[in-house]
Amino acid sequence: MVTGHPAGLPPLFLDRSLGRRQVPELLRAAGLQLQTLSEVYGIPADEDVSDVDWLELAGGHGWPVLMKDERIRYRPAERDALLMNEVKGFCLTSGNLRAAEMADQFLAVIDSVADACVEPGPFLYAVSVRGLSRLDLS
């Protein structure tokens, strides 16, 4: 079990796809430092923030992004924002997980996330019960 934020890992940024409360609370309870889209933009403004805007923000701050929308790499505007802003992304591959399962999958790979973040972005990794696997952005 994780007991603290890995050394050298910047604060994490959580996309709205992970929810406003349950997943962030579980990750914080494990000691991770993070910000959510709703904390940065406020409620209800967070509902109207485009993926392009928050990808630019996260990349500009060097915040690794945790998300659930791996299709982001196929949408031209979002893919371009991910690439141009050198985003370091980590995406759950299963869309049918409860909050505790989502948090558990991220916590199980958090040391690998920290290791990956030593490298420059942009990149996108799939997160699954088997660990991390780098996704093609070309």
Question: Residue locations for each model-derived region?
Answer:
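Non-catalytic interface/targeting segments
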Residues: 1-30, 39-40, 92-138
